Amino acid sequence: MPHVGNLLDDRNRDLIALRPEATAMEAAQAMADRRIGSIVVTDDDGRPLGIFTERDLMVRVIVAGRDARTTRLSDVMTAELFTAHPAEKAADVRRAMQERHIRHVPIVVDGRVIGMLSLRDVLRAVLADKTHEVQAIKAYIQGFEDEDSPSPSERERED
């Protein structure tokens, strides 16, 4: 089973983070420019304070009637932040993300964010691992089937 650290590549490590005083408009522009669905909100030392997602933008800014140009991230970010460590199993993180109904998880080491994974990243890895398991089991079973079936010379004798 892959670990979270195995899933981090250059794309996941090229983290974009904003300070809490940044505006929702700045976050929306950064997400649109990078084609990402969330931004980690950090302090000066890179420690995570929260996360701002497309859903936060929609529900807490637009639907709430706030002005994205003046609304600070600290006022609309999700402060209850679920994070993962590179040593955690991808399947465990997937389960936790599904239970919490979240699609993005910051990866944290020593209190600092080193990357971000999406539910899609995690599901791809879990699927690839399960596919590999199925192929291994299939090969194992076929090995037994080959042992049980008569060899070509035995088949000739049967005819």
Regions found by a protein language model. Name each.
Residues 31-34, 39-56, 97, 105-121:
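A glycine-centered beta-loop-beta connector
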Residues 22-25, 45, 75-76, 111, ...:
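Residue-level signal for alpha-helical context at structural boundaries
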